[in-house]
């Protein structure tokens, strides 16, 4: 199978599952450091899983998101809500257009490298906020 894909891999369970499911198609794993409270733990895991599979991994810094966007998911913001992952709790964790920004960058990198596909594993429980 031809390695003609880029994957956006956070290091969380959704993107890592997609990484393993399509490992034979993926030429590049991309993580984004956008100031999330989870980045320090998840990005090293994304890198580790890519290395384990022999897939190149890069991390792209997006510091501007932490400075200009409001979300409880970002470092220095209000606490992330505890409890069940309900619609109201989810709304405070939204980083506005985060996935769109990451997808646009990944698509540009894919195009620049002659890769045909971009893979992204969005969390199914986020439906209420989009």
Protein language model regions, located:
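ATP-dependent adenylation/nucleotidyltransferase module used to activate substrates
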Residues: 1-130
């Amino acid at each position: 199978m031809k390695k003609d894909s880029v994957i956006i891999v956070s290091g969380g369970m959704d993107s890592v599952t997609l990484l393993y499911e399509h490992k034979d198609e993926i030429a590049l794993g991309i993580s984004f450091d956008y100031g999330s409270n989870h980045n320090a733990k998840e990005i090293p895991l994304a890198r580790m899983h890519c290395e384990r599979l022999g897939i190149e991994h890069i991390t792209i810094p997006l510091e501007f998101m932490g400075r200009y966007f409001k979300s409880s998911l970002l470092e220095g913001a209000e606490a992330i809500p505890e409890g069940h992952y309900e619609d109201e709790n989810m709304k405070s964790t939204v980083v506005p257009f985060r996935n769109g920004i990451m997808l646009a960058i990944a698509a540009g990198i894919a195009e620049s490298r002659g890769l045909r596909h971009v893979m992204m594993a969005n969390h199914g429980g986020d439906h209420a906020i989009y």
